[in-house]
Design a protein with these regions (language model features):
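Helix-to-loop junction immediately C-terminal to a conserved catalytic motif
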Residues: 50
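ABC ATPase NBD coupling module
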Residues: 66-82, 87, 111-115, 224-228
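Conserved ABC ATPase signature
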Residues: 134-138, 142
């Protein structure tokens, strides 16, 4: 049984059905991409999976629990879901260290546990040298690493990443890709949606391409990049990028 099993998602706004029966799944220790052109329904599907939007129909099962109607905080607390928003979510006026400690305090961790966990995350994400810097003064890549570190505080089984490669330079993208691969090695499931399909496909085990509210195709990077309909409607008719994986 997959860790995350999404079946038959439907969402209608007015007379327009923006998501029409989307299914996908993610296993533990697997990186899965959710791709598609603007207006395809991928973002709505992703946000229904997170608990930001409630579906009109369909199911979201996380770790064997049906969480379809659960708000995001319950999915995080009781379902083992971590979430990285597209928009920067750091506390700008707090130091890097206090960004981590504040979340730990909200989760009810005792002082000794907070300190130990904080040191580990600062080391793991190479942000120890900026621990006392206010978040408003650190770089975009450092903010991204801090956000991912915060998403790991609750020891999630799965992390949902919304546009993790947006607004950062190529070197930082490579660093974030390495971090995501390490999370997979630790057995954490990853679901990514991003408009930068090449960077996403370079690290995914499988991807789903959404078009007109439905899954157009799914498979490995080679399989989706060489799928005739995916090339026609999304990737274009340029060179086949079969070495993206």
């Amino acid at each position: 049984m997959p860790l995350l099993d999404v079946t038959g998602l439907v969402k209608t706004y007015g007379s327009r059905r923006v998501v029409d029966g989307v299914d996908f799944e993610v296993d533990s220790g697997e990186i899965v991409g959710l791709l598609g052109p603007n207006g395809a329904g991928k973002t709505t599907s992703f946000r229904m999976t997170c608990g930001i939007i409630e579906p009109d129909a369909g199911k979201v099962v996380l770790g064997g629990l049906e969480v379809t109607r659960w708000p995001m905080y319950l999915r995080a607390r009781d379902g083992g879901m971590g979430y990285l928003a597209q928009e920067q979510s750091v506390f700008r006026k707090l130091s890097v260290e206090n960004n981590l400690l504040a979340v730990m305090e909200m989760l009810g961790m005792d002082r000794a546990a907070r300190r130990k966990r904080c040191e580990g995350l600062l080391e793991q994400f190479d942000i120890k040298h900026i621990r006392r810097s206010k978040a408003m003064f650190i770089s975009g890549g450092e903010k991204r690493r801090l956000e991912i570190a915060r998403s790991l505080i609750s020891n999630p089984k799965i992390i949902l990443l919304d546009e993790p490669f947006t607004g950062i330079d190529p070197v930082t993208i490579n660093n974030i890709q390495r971090i995501i691969r390490r999370l997979r090695e630790d057995g954490i499931a990853i679901l990514i949606t991003d408009h930068r399909e090449q960077e996403t496909l370079a690290i995914t085990d499988r991807s789903y391409v959404i078009r007109s509210g439905k899954v157009l195709c799914h498979g490995t990077a080679d399989e989706v990049l060489n799928h005739p309909d995916a090339r026609k409607y999304y990737f274009g008719d340029g060179p086949k990028l079969g070495d993206a994986a």
